[in-house]
Amino acid sequence: MKNNLPIKSRLLYKRLLSYVKPFWPVLLLGVLANILYSGIDAGFTYMTKLFLDKSFITIDLDFVKQIPLIVLIGITLRGLVSSLGSYCMTWVARSVVKVLRQTVFSHIIHLPADYYDEATSGQLLSKILYDVEQVAQVSADALTDFIQNICLVIGLLTVMMVICWQLSLMFLLTIPFVGIIVNYTNKRVRRISHKVQKTMGEVTEIASEAIEGYRVVRIFGGERYEITKFNKATEYSRKNDMKVAISKAINVSGVQLVIAIGIAMIIMAAIHLSTVITISAGSFLAIIAAMLQLIKPMKTLTTLNATIQRGLAGAESVFNLLDLPLERNNGLILKDKIRGEIEFKHVYHAYRQGQNILHDVNFVIEAGTSVALVGHSGSGKTTIASLLPRFYELSQGMITLDGMPIQQLSLESLRKQMSLVSQNVTLFNDTLANNIAYGRFDASREQIITAAKLAYADEFIKQLPDGYDTRVGENGVLLSGGQRQRIAIARAILKDAPILILDEATSALDSESEHYIQAALEQVMNGRTTLIIAHRLSTIKHAHKIIVMQHGRIVEQGSHQELLDMDGHYAQLYKVQQFGRVNEEVVV
């Protein structure tokens, strides 16, 4: 899934411009304002020649009297266009970032499940927050500074050429050397910027894991280990930042040295060629002033280069993500609910072209019946449950829904027919009502309460300070494990889909809660096609059919009693669990 091939700068610029294009009127206004700003600065430099020549050599009192007014108008206009240009460019940049960030988030939401298996939440957050923000610097700060300073450089060089083209040509000889320095630092900064972005992802990942798993960190005494790991990552980030700073310093000092040599050459030429080149004192000082003024914009442009390279590296990272293929989402759109007959035909599956996890799996779930998958960890139960809603695409074989291959159905239509309650409950930092109604945003409060009652969640919800309007915290941290599980079951009940997938749905409940939930689930499962994954065999006795998995293969299937009578794998598992449960009760 990963795509780390470098993208050429030209293509990056072109692709970035496609995001800027919708805002071109504001961008054009900002560019014109910045050009005018630079033109005023260059005009003031030319005014130096006129002021000196007409004030001290050929005295022109009328012109001298106009100087204060010219300066006042020029500085006022300069301030206005500077503010206008800055506002317009920032507006464009933030608009680009908004669109790009929304595009990245939408793309991540629709990436295949195997991408999430590889990428960490810290890496993804770094792309959404840090990498996209680097693009903002290219779109706003860097672009504004680039336009202002490149226009100022052109304006000052034009002034120099108008005043004395011979001396100006000597200064232009230094530009190729500036280009060599900039080109060298370009490559170095881009390379280091990629490392900086990778490091930021690692820093975010380490912090995210330590914060989310704070209970494990503390109970196992991992505070020092996590702090050391975080410190190493931040130190590595600091070193890379310092490498960028060194590159900037080399860039700036090198360019300043070249410009200083150019100024020295012009002064020497003006002294030694005074008999050949006729130039007034005002013209000579104006050229020197223009060259001195050139130092700042050229310094800014060379420093700006590092910002641009960081932004391009961020853009490359973002575009590499956007180039990843999305889930295949083509097929028929189902308008009505299906009956719910499921069939697996010669199904094989391997994750990322590795060894097969499933081997020639064949079974049928009749509409409205329940089938339980049992077996040791790693036997392929969860893989089967993940293939049904097409979280992963089949390697070989076919899965049908009412006789239709699921690959021929749109993802939205397919998943609309299913509800899922998994062992790892996901709750959002929102109200209990909104968590229950997730995916059914049009549900009424009465429907939400009914679902909660069926899941035996209504009683504890009413005891909370704000009832159904109580916020649950990040991933339901304010609720107990059993309470979170019941909210997830209520969510599945409210969706009222014809197919129900229960992946260890009662694993986090105490014995009393489990008893009530089992009773509720039996009512909810009535008339629905239900796929149950369970380790505790006592919870699936009443399933219409039980399928026993081992090493990705079906080794037995039948009802609870039929499998016990066979005295095979299932009977052994059942005896082991019953013996363990008896011992547990004796200990208690």
Swiss-Prot record:
Membrane topology per record: Multi-pass membrane protein
Coiled-coil segments on the chain, per record: none
GO annotation, cellular component aspect: plasma membrane
Transmembrane segments: 23-43, 56-76, 141-161, 162-182, 257-277, 278-298
Domain of life (superkingdom): Bacteria
UniProt EC number: 7.5.2.6
Oligomeric form and interacting partners: Homodimer.
Domain notes: In MsbA the ATP-binding domain (NBD) and the transmembrane domain (TMD) are fused.
Protein name: ATP-dependent lipid A-core flippase
Source organism (scientific name): Legionella pneumophila (strain Lens)
Top-level taxonomy: Bacteria, Pseudomonadati, Pseudomonadota, Gammaproteobacteria, Legionellales
